[in-house]
A protein has these predicted regions:
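Phosphate/pyrophosphate-binding active-site segments
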Residues: 241-276
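N-terminal export/assembly segments and adjacent metallocofactor-ligating motifs
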Residues: 1-253, 365, 529, 541-543, ...
């Protein structure tokens, strides 16, 4: 018999009925979903014992305590340590996903010389030869992004053995110098551009004390801190010193500026008060407020060692520059660093975990371990009124061919010691002095250093998760001028011209290297504006023939680039706000804009 129409209908009906009972379609859906979530390259947590380990975050100067939930030996989640005296149990978004940084694609994986892979021994030989070949007027410098560490001591010892060694730091690496901020007793903060509510000092410490201080934000951009402040006073870029002087006069009742008078009334009603920002006028304002050396103001601490601001190094004087870059630090100002190098034959060595940033301009790239891949240290937390120290034990296995920056400098100096040896000496010195107390992360208890049996026991406590905090330093006769040395000069602002009638300002820092696994949260949601976004007031855009969402071209005296126009009435008229990507190493620049 042939295949009839009845057979076709029977087969079709039976297949349809069978599909309702067979597990094949549902298995296909399940397997497809599982496979789509496990593409090659996505790290998979190990299956094993779940345990807790402790470390300290070194992505920024806050030095927050970290409790890591681990499966086997791999951390799968990070949270803050409850009761931590600096972080108050809080981690910032970058700290919460810090263990993801090891999986970023643009990592430096092996030593490079002239862009080509070399052995670490050859890199050491090349850098040593470059140092030996320097002329009598050329210096050798190390740019230290986190002064005050044991690694900083390694750098200073190495440079002390050279004829012209310079230990320097990025601008504002130590904005308050030998002083910390008594935030717990402060009742008002007058901020000149400081990101008080956006990563300033230790975020947990700021949030814990936010309810009892008034925040006045003085800056041209409507930043996140400005939007959350009790009062935002927009000022033109470069006029911050003038406004600080007006507030100082208003405190004596001698100004006609209404905004300055309002700020002065808030400061007088909420004492003790402090002013944070750069420039001599801000330092004089703190002297007027009597905030230096008193509770609720700026208090001195013991551990400060002054370091040269790289901006103060003479131009064209550095023959060999070693640059340490951290895993989570802000981009270093390459335009500034380039001016400090001798015009010809300068050698740049990048000690970095990244292939971008300064590595793009370096003659030698020495790959450094990523955060959590090697034993590290966290010095005194930013803005702390007492000295501090903690270890950051490794939680991840580091790839081969990585060299910690301090280890590289020790090998340059032909020192047989290791970086852990230097850290042990630091811990032994803390035990010998016998001051302060140690807060241990696992049990959230504080123990006086004098009650710890030996330096070895203190070292074990540090490795298990702990922070040492020194005792307070007695106050003394300090002046506001003592703070000026640490603040640094404000950035110059060029006035608009007929050719460039607008001011382009940097609004917000460039985002640090983030988690490669969390990018969908902002790439697909639009929560973060594009890197080429140019935000301006509606009137500013319309006066230049633009509409919201237009593509435009921004011109400055040094650069030209395409942008996407975004209207925002919170932006000051005559101002264009952009991220640091478009600023070409400047914070403020005159600019013009036209439709693309």
């Amino acid at each position: 018999m042939g295949f009839t129409r009845r057979d076709l209908l029977t087969f079709t009906g039976g297949s349809a009925a069978g599909m309702l009972f067979t597990p094949v379609p549902w298995s296909l859906l399940r397997d497809t979903a599982v496979l789509s979530e496990n593409w090659p390259g996505v790290p998979q947590p190990l299956h094993g014992e779940i345990r807790t380990r402790y470390t300290t975050c070194t992505l920024c100067p806050a030095g927050c305590g970290v409790r890591a939930r681990c499966v086997g030996d791999r951390p799968v989640s990070l949270v803050g340590v409850s009761g931590h005296p600096a972080s108050r149990g809080v981690l910032c978004p970058a700290g919460l996903v810090g263990h993801h940084l090891a999986f970023c694609r643009n990592r430096a994986a092996e030593p490079l010389a002239g862009g080509k892979p070399v052995a670490i021994e050859r890199a050491l030989t090349g850098v040593s030869a470059a140092i030996a070949a320097r002329g009598p007027r050329e210096s050798v410098a190390i740019l230290d992004p986190r002064p005050g560490r044991a690694a900083s001591l390694v750098y200073r010892r190495f440079l002390a053995g050279l004829p012209r060694g310079v230990h320097c730091a990025p601008p504002n690496a130590e904005p308050y110098g030998a002083f910390g901020i008594d935030l717990e007793n402060t009742r008002a903060i007058l901020s000149f551009g400081a990101p008080v509510l956006d990563g300033w000092l230790s975020p947990g410490r700021v949030l814990a004390n936010r309810s009892h201080f008034q925040l006045i934000q003085i800056e041209p951009a409507y930043s996140r801190t400005a939007s959350l402040a009790d009062l935002w006073v927009p000022v033109l870029p470069g006029s911050e010193d003038d406004f600080a002087a007006a507030v100082a006069r208003a405190l004596d009742g001698e100004t006609t500026d209404a905004h300055a008078a309002e700020v002065a009334r808030i400061l007088l009603r909420n004492k003790p008060a402090i002013a944070v920002g750069a420039g001599a006028a801000v330092a004089r304002l703190n002297a007027k407020l009597a905030s230096v050396g008193r509770p609720g103001g700026f208090l001195p601490r013991r551990d400060f060692t002054a370091v040269t601001d790289v901006a103060r190094v003479p131009d064209g004087s550095i023959g060999v520059l070693l640059i340490e870059e951290t895993a989570g630090g802000d981009p270093l100002p390459w335009d500034l660093l380039r001016r400090k190098l001798v015009p010809q034959d300068a050698v740049v060595v990048a000690l970095t975990p990244w292939l971008d940033g300064c590595a793009r301009h370096a003659d030698y790239v020495i790959p450094a371990p990523m955060y959590l891949e090697s034993l590290d240290e966290a010095p005194t937390p930013a803005g702390s009124t007492v000295a501090g120290f903690s270890l950051s034990p490794a939680l991840l296995t580091a790839p081969p061919k990585l060299t910690p920056p301090a280890e590289f400098v020790l090998r340059l100096a032909h020192d047989s010691g290791t970086y852990p040896d230097i850290l042990k000496q630091r811990v032994a010195a803390i035990k010998k002095d016998g001051r302060g107390a140690v807060f241990t992360y696992p049990d959230a208890k504080s123990t006086r250093v004098s009650d710890i049996a030996s330096a070895g026991d203190l070292w074990k406590s540090m490795l298990a998760g702990a922070v040492w905090l020194d005792g307070p330093l007695p106050g003394g006769p300090f002046r506001g001028a003592d703070l000026q040395v640490c603040a640094g000069p404000p950035g110059p602002a060029l006035p608009p011209t007929p050719e460039y009638p607008l001011l382009l300002i940097a609004a917000g820092n460039a985002p640090p290297h983030g988690s490669p696994l969390m990018s969908k949260l902002y790439r697909e949601s639009g929560l973060r504006r594009p890197a080429n976004a140019a935000t301006m007031h509606t009137d500013t855009g319309r006066n230049h023939g633009l509409a919201d969402g237009d593509q435009a071209v921004v011109n400055t005296p040094t650069a030209s680039f395409k942008v996407q126009v975004i209207f925002d009435v919170a932006v000051m008229p005559g101002i264009i706000e952009m991220g640091m990507v478009g600023m070409v190493g400047q914070a403020v620049s005159p600019a013009s804009i036209r439709r693309a």
